[in-house]
């Protein structure tokens, strides 16, 4: 909700599933790092070792807990250098609760949910009728009225981008919805989780020509677009220009304000980083942990800083929106 207050156009979340098939918002497949699960004696025997993207991983896996059990936990801030005052105060929320936050906002706020780790989820969570994780994901969006291709009237009422690192998931749901999809691309040494394809294969001209039939854009890790050596951003790759040549949007991730994430080229100034990526690299959108700073940058650098045309347009779009039934 704070992101909405700070001006976010879209709010982003990763979607996983509980043991009993309820879709929830959570970043990791294990609960260890960002919840207090280790404090619960009744869950002490739940620790497991599963293969996750080719790596044996041990922890308290979200797929081994029912929604009721997940709701009994409280979440914590992952990074020790960030504000810790909210640790232990909030529950894990469901996908439906997340959607409601966006729909209840006083203006149009889009959502940007990720189909997260579908290989693992489909392996350990089973739904009636042979349905898959991806089916339940799309059903949830349809239930709340999300429909329509990019920039269509229906899409503008309730904007959404569907993202995933798993290309087979995006291809699978392309037969169920025309909502815009974004293919996420990991670091150069991490293959795709479902097809085991290398970074170089999925960023080749041949693959971009293939995937553009199913997605609106790509979402690469930003340090693969502009390689980094000794904390200096180097010469950009040509991936953005090759994507744009195929009418693919580019939405890199993740931009953060802390000094440890800002390369020396930007003099520890996040506004310089935004300026470089938006005006030099020419990205079409980006993921940030600091909505307020990006929103301020957009406001301060708008061609007509005092022109409220954009605000009026957003208000008109908001008037088109109706609550889901």
Model features per residue range: what roles?
Residues 1-325:
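Phosphate-group recognition and catalysis centered on beta-loop-alpha active-site segments
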């Amino acid at each position: 909700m704070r992101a909405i207050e700070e001006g976010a156009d879209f709010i982003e979340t990763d979607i996983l599933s509980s043991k009993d098939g309820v879709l929830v918002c959570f970043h990791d497949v294990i609960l260890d790092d960002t919840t207090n699960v280790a404090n619960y004696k009744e869950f002490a025997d739940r620790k497991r070792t599963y293969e996750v993207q080719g790596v044996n991983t041990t922890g308290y896996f979200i797929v081994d807990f029912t929604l009721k059990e997940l709701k009994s936990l409280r979440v914590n801030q992952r990074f020790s250098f960030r504000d810790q005052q909210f640790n232990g105060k909030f529950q894990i929320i469901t996908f439906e609760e997340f959607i409601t936050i966006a729909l209840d906002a006083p203006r149009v706020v889009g959502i940007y949910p990720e189909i997260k780790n579908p290989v693992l989820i489909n392996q350990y969570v089973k739904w009636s009728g042979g349905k898959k994780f991806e089916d339940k994901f799309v059903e949830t969006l349809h239930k709340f009225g999300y429909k329509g291709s990019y920039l269509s009237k229906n899409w503008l009422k309730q904007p959404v981008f569907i993202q995933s690192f798993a290309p087979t998931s995006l291809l699978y749901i392309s037969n169920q919805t025309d909502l815009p999809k974004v293919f996420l691309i990991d670091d150069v040494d991490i293959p795709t989780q479902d097809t085991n394809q290398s970074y170089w294969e999925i960023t080749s001209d041949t693959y971009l020509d293939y995937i553009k039939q199913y997605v609106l854009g790509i979402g690469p890790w930003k340090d693969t677009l502009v390689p980094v050596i000794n904390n200096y951003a180097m010469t950009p790759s040509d991936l953005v220009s090759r994507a744009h040549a195929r009418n693919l949007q580019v939405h890199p991730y993740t931009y953060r304000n802390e000094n440890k994430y800002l390369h020396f080229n930007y003099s520890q100034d996040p506004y310089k980083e935004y300026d470089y990526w938006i005006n030099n690299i020419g990205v079409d959108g980006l993921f940030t942990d600091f909505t307020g700073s990006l929103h301020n940058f957009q406001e301060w650098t708008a061609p007509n800083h005092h022109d409220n045309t954009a605000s009026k347009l957003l208000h008109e779009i908001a008037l088109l929106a109706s609550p889901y039934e």
